[in-house]
Amino acid sequence: MDQKGSQRALLAQTINEIVKLLIEAHNQKKDVNLNRLKCIVAQKNGLSFQPKLVDIIAGVPSDYKDSLLPKLKAKPVRTASGIAVVAVMSKPHRCPHINFTGNICVYCPGGPDSDFEYSTQSYTGYEPTSMRAIRARYNPYLQTRGRLNQLMQLGHSVDKVEFIVMGGTFMSLPEDYRDFFIRNLHDALSGHTSASVEEAVAYSERSKMKCIGITIETRPDYCLPRHLNDMLLYGCTRLEIGVQSTYEDVARDTNRGHTVKSVCETFHMAKDTGYKVVIHMMPDLPNVGLERDKEQFLELFESPAFRPDGLKLYPTLVIRGTGLYELWKTGRYQSYPPSVLVDLIATILSLVPPWTRVYRVQRDIPMPLVSSGVEHGNLREHAMAKMKELGLKCRDVRTREVGIQEIHNKVRPEDVELIRRDYTANGGWETFISYEDPKQDILIGLLRLRKISDKAHRPELKGNVSVVRELHVYGSVVSVADRDPKKFQHQGYGSLLMEEAERIAREEHGSDKIAVISGVGTREYYRKLGYELDGPYMSKMLDSAAA
């Protein structure tokens, strides 16, 4: 047997032994360090490399798959929130505000005119999502199928999928390309080949793999009523809006191409349409300074003109080929020292209210491409350690959600209570209802309810209407058709949250109707609760419900 053949035989033997030891440990109710086990068995058998997790998962007998897969799952955080997130990229295209300002933002890498010419705007082409998109030649169907297969091989459930459409300003692309892109995302889940977005959505609604939502990255100038209407037809439920700074002078100096006033107007319109609003913010921009950075985040969370539902923190990076790189090279811009940046991020995280989710704390750009800026690949961990040292707590949604708590702290909720928080934001009355264990500060499920303002442009939301902008029960993914007593999805928390939302809408808001901005794949769930399709929303009349 040649060397290659003998290595293959050793690999098969090693995988069999590892699986056998895993089954023994499971039967004896023992925990196993998989990395250590792989190392020991591979070394014992004279294998020159460790077997891949995908191969070990493939070697697990079918009668042990259900019990062993959760223990073998790679990066369990990927589906800890109850959803498999699939990030896809649109084709490279120029940023639309070049036509008005003559150039892109000073810090922005990537795009067709950059040193990274195969990348989309604001990406380098070396981020994991970018590389998957380039391999698939930016084909949305291939990107989706490839990522789903990858997640399944790593032991994750892909029963509930949320898409994030990245790669510049998607809504600035031609309508026929946008329709093609969205159609293929839905078709990749349903297996059907559709001729229109409407047909794709109809098949996706009944698909085994449910599209529970689509998130689209955009800019305030591409969040006008016509854009909001188009995104509703796509099945979009969440917007990621690039804000970067709450200061008008910084927006002007960095060449953003829009004002902060337009950001506030966008938030108002988006929330009155039912969308969840996540914003991108960049600490350490030129001409800001540490104190102004702290003040803008205080304003972001406390001013009713902002108050986003989610936040992506992207500390400024200096990357070759950008205007900022030239400023840095000539000494006109200097990044915060690493310790100062960690302190700033820790301060920002301590300010986050309990109804806001911090999705990211840094960009996915590989460190070798960064000339100056973030020096830690795990900035969130450093910031959390600093908070612990200072006696501060991060109370954002992600830190408290039950799936993350189980993975990181091995704690489960005991005394669960219904908790309500009210606040005003963007011209409307917001109510954040949640099921939590207040003693351990663990979040199990949440609902965002809004009393629509009189500025709503959608006909379905005019008059006395309340809208549910988000309903989410956390914990690792459970199939829509299954119930698992150890997991929190499908335990009735969702319907209890909806009952409370209906009561508040009827008795306190004085609303005649309650609407839900629902992902395409979750419409059937709302039908069971007495809701009907009302344009792109699921709605219920409250007067008849009360009777």
From Swiss-Prot:
Q: Give the CDD domains listed for this entry.
A: Radical_SAM
The reaction(s) this protein catalyses: uridine(34) in tRNA + acetyl-CoA + S-adenosyl-L-methionine + H2O = 5-(carboxymethyl)uridine(34) in tRNA + 5'-deoxyadenosine + L-methionine + CoA + 2 H(+)
Enzyme Commission number: 2.3.1.311
Binding-site residues, acetyl-CoA: K160, E470, L471, H472, V473, Y493, G494, S495, Y526
| Cofactor(s) this protein cannot do without | [4Fe-4S] cluster
Domain N-acetyltransferase stretches: 392-547
What pathway, per the record? tRNA modification; 5-methoxycarbonylmethyl-2-thiouridine-tRNA biosynthesis
* Keywords, sorted A to Z: 4Fe-4S, Acyltransferase, Iron, Iron-sulfur, Metal-binding, RNA-binding, S-adenosyl-L-methionine, Transferase, tRNA processing, tRNA-binding
InterPro entries per the UniProt record, alphabetical: Acyl_CoA_acyltransferase, ELP3, ELP3-like, ELP3-like_N, Elp3/MiaA/NifB-like_rSAM, GNAT_dom, Radical_SAM_C, rSAM
tRNA-binding in keyword set: yes
Which amino acid positions bind [4Fe-4S] cluster, per UniProt?
Answer: C95, C105, C108
Instruction: List, alphabetically, the Pfam families matched.
Output: Acetyltransf_1, ELP3_N, Radical_SAM, Radical_SAM_C
List, alphabetically, the GO terms of the cellular component aspect.
Answer: cytoplasm; elongator holoenzyme complex; nucleus
Do the record's keywords include Chaperone?
Answer: no
Q: Where is the Radical SAM core domain?
A: 78-368
A Gene Ontology annotation in the biological process aspect, one of them, is: tRNA wobble base 5-methoxycarbonylmethyl-2-thiouridinylation
Q: How is the cofactor bound?
A: Binds 1 [4Fe-4S] cluster. The cluster is coordinated with 3 cysteines and an exchangeable S-adenosyl-L-methionine.
GO MF annotation: an example: metal ion binding
What the entry lists under PANTHER family is as follows:
ELONGATOR COMPLEX PROTEIN 3, HISTONE ACETYLTRANSFERASE-RELATED
Write out the similarity annotation. Belongs to the ELP3 family.
Assembly description: Component of the elongator complex.
The task this protein performs is described as: Catalytic tRNA acetyltransferase subunit of the elongator complex which is required for multiple tRNA modifications, including mcm5U (5-methoxycarbonylmethyl uridine), mcm5s2U (5-methoxycarbonylmethyl-2-thiouridine), and ncm5U (5-carbamoylmethyl uridine). In the elongator complex, acts as a tRNA uridine(34) acetyltransferase by mediating formation of carboxymethyluridine in the wobble base at position 34 in tRNAs.
Q: Name the chain's protein.
A: Elongator complex protein 3
Q: Which organism is it from?
A: Caenorhabditis elegans
Source organism lineage? Eukaryota, Metazoa, Ecdysozoa, Nematoda, Chromadorea
> Coding gene?
elpc-3
